[in-house]
Amino acid sequence: QAIGDLADDVTIEMLSDQPSTRSPTDTPMWDAIGRAVQAADPDASVHPGLIVGGTDGRFYRPKGAVVYGAGIFSPTVDMADFGSRFHGNNERIDLDSLRLVTDFWDHVIRGFDDLVAP
């Protein structure tokens, strides 16, 4: 219906029939990520979501691993340009985002250790 009169000229091909995977949000790692986000921006919050594409997490989750994709990027990054910065020609990250994401993961790792250390 969405393509109207073009329907007869369009071929739809299934590229994958693997269902999406997900990780639970009631874990120490999720809590550590939330704390790291709050440390970077007290007004921010963490919410689960889906993205187009795939990661290696889809192979690890069925084996019992908890896998999250997370990061913090500079508010100066143009979101219209954001997607073109990864996995293509001229792959790059701005220095402010590099600092933010490095500090973020340092906070996640230290926070996770605090949450699970005996």
Task: Please give the residue ranges for each predicted region.
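Metal-dependent amide/peptide-bond hydrolase catalytic core
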Residues: 1-106, 110-118
